[in-house]
């Protein structure tokens, strides 16, 4: 991971934080309380989740509050997230946005002051041990996806043609060989082409060779399946 790469990732993260701030400032209290596609979560809850995550990662203290409704929670991480979210449900959307602005200001100052080895050294991440720069890519993706969850609930399109949108699509595209080869069980020698249209345009060709699905530059055979996806709400 080069210096330029992690700096670009940070820039993507900062841009998404700024987009969330601008978006949140435009919302009414009713809009903040609107349910989203995330089970049990409102627009406000999505932002509360991002606050809780950044507080935890920054060593800024976890809540002692315990949520009582855990019906939609599937695992220990989800339970931890729910405690953070539920702790802020009695607050106004404006108050939650203010906390988000404060915590992201602190996090940005920390990252901007960190030495290069902080980003290149390995640490534990949701995908195992990896450089901190990789973890930050996951954070940028998570923030952008939840921004889109919030926007979709209110039918307010925005921040789709952005660096974080491209980063998110590219990270999701890395998982497509697993989807094609294992989950869809595409047969040996077959080729699948996926074309993602605007605003983030990508064309991914995947061929199964020796039982393994791999991304290729040029399909080795006529595609067995071709599909086009509009990228607008792809992150949701």
Model-derived regions: residue spans:
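Helix-loop segments that flank and shape redox-cofactor active sites
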Residues: 21-42, 110-130
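Non-cleavable N-terminal signal-anchor transmembrane helices
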Residues: 1-34
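Alpha-helical initiation/capping and key positions within long helical/coiled-coil segments
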Residues: 8, 12, 45, 49, ...
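Contiguous mid-protein beta-loop-alpha structural module that forms a pocket-lining wall or clamp
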Residues: 85-155, 159
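Short, contiguous alpha-helical
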Residues: 33-75, 125-180
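Short, helix-capping/interhelical loops that line the mouth of catalytic, cofactor-
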Residues: 1-8, 56-113, 117-119
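C-terminal interaction segments
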Residues: 218-236
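A glycine-rich beta-turn/hairpin centered on an aromatic-Pro dipeptide
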Residues: 165-208
């Amino acid at each position: 991971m080069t210096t330029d790469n992690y700096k670009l990732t940070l820039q993507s993260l900062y841009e998404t934080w700024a987009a969330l701030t601008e978006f949140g400032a435009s919302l009414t209290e009713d809009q903040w309380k609107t349910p989203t596609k995330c089970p049990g979560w409102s627009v406000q809850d999505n932002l509360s989740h991002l606050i809780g995550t950044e507080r935890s990662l920054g060593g800024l203290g976890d809540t002692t509050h315990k949520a009582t409704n855990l019906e939609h929670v599937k695992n220990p991480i989800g339970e931890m997230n729910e405690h953070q979210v539920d702790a802020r449900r009695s607050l106004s959307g404006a108050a939650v946005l203010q906390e988000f602005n404060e915590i992201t200001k602190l996090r940005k100052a920390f990252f901007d002051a960190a030495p290069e080895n902080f980003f290149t050294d390995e640490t534990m991440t949701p995908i195992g041990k990896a450089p901190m720069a990789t973890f930050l890519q996951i954070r940028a993706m998570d923030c952008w996806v939840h921004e889109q969850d919030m926007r979709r609930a209110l039918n307010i399109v925005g921040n789709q043609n952005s660096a974080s949108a491209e980063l998110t699509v590219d990270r999701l595209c890395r998982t497509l060989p697993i989807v094609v080869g294992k989950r869809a069980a595409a047969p040996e020698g077959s080729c699948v082409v996926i074309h993602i249209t605007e605003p983030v345009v990508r064309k991914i060709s995947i061929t199964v060779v020796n039982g393994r699905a791999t991304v290729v530059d040029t399909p080795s055979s006529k595609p067995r399946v071709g599909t086009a996806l509009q990228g607008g709400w792809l992150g949701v």
